[in-house]
Amino acid sequence: MKTLVLLSALVLLAFQVQADPIQNTDEETKTEEQPGEDDQAVSVSFGDPEGSSLQEESLRDLVCYCRKRGCKRRERMNGTCRKGHLMYTLCCR
């Protein structure tokens, strides 16, 4: 059940990332790595207002990052992110 919820959240996150309008400016189209570019945080929360077993501590706040180079310690690879034509690794903890 937890796996199903996690996968559903990741699918919804992927749809949201693809649906966001992309604004191309000169700064955004540079392929050079900018400071802090590896740490694009995405926060995902689970649960309903009345409370359920899904609101356990491990599922309450799932924080994901789109990283250029592999995941850091305590993070797991959960898929890919796309910003424009560039692909990133989706790392969650």
From Swiss-Prot:
Residues 1-16 form the signal peptide. Probably contributes to the antimicrobial barrier function of the small bowel mucosa. It is found in: Secreted. The keyword Secreted applies. This is Alpha-defensin 3. Residues 22-56 are annotated as: Disordered. Belongs to the alpha-defensin family. Residues 17-58 form a propeptide. One of its GO terms (biological process) is cellular response to lipopolysaccharide. Paneth cells of the small bowel. Its main location: secreted. Disulfide bonds join 64-92, 66-81, 71-91. One of its GO terms (cellular component) is extracellular space. The keyword Membrane does not apply. InterPro entries: Alpha-defensin, Alpha-defensin_C, Alpha-defensin_N, Beta/alpha-defensin_C. Keywords: Antibiotic, Antimicrobial, Defensin, Disulfide bond, Secreted, Signal. Transmembrane segments: none annotated.
